[in-house]
Amino acid sequence: MKEYYAARAKEYDQIYAKPERQVDLRLIEQWLPARFENARVLEIAAGTGYWTQFIAPVASNVLGLDASAETLQIAQARPNNESVQWLVGDAYALPAPVEPYDAAFAGFWFSHVPLARQKEFLLGLNKTLRSGARVVMLDNLYVEGNSTPLTEPDPEGNTYQVRTLADGSTHRVLKNYPNEFDLCELVAPFGEQATYTTWQYYWAFEYVLR
């Protein structure tokens, strides 16, 4: 996965240029910032910083973490991201903060987490947050005829896509599509105020840490 996103870094933002998704993107760009006003935010899988640029202007401060140095180089160059701190790191081994964060955001990351590691990831994330912190995840809905087709699931139930980059290389990428019930069940032991929001091509899920 790390190698795939490093190779894809320069062409990653092409996904935000798809004509049919522009209405959704404008709506989400307006919806997202209010979740992070005046908050100390940890962003997981910050990537090229596309979503960071909408969070940073309203947040108290943001730490954007990603496994790929190549994507973070692009993130640093965005106009609204000058004050953001960036860190190359592992989403499954998050650094302990000096002070717990007020909020966390994971955009287009949770769908890449293997089913067997979803609980592990969330518990690790929660350790970096204060009680009452808000967690927001944003990701893709599977839209027949528009989304990249899925291959057969593996023995654990994970699904995959075969993606081709501009250089012609092909990559088998884990891509799961959790539903509202799956997400609510996962966070029930430690989260409250769970909210699931959908647009035509995307979903968002929020919870507040107890």
Place the predicted regions along the sequence by residue:
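Core SAM-dependent methyltransferase catalytic element
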Residues: 192-210
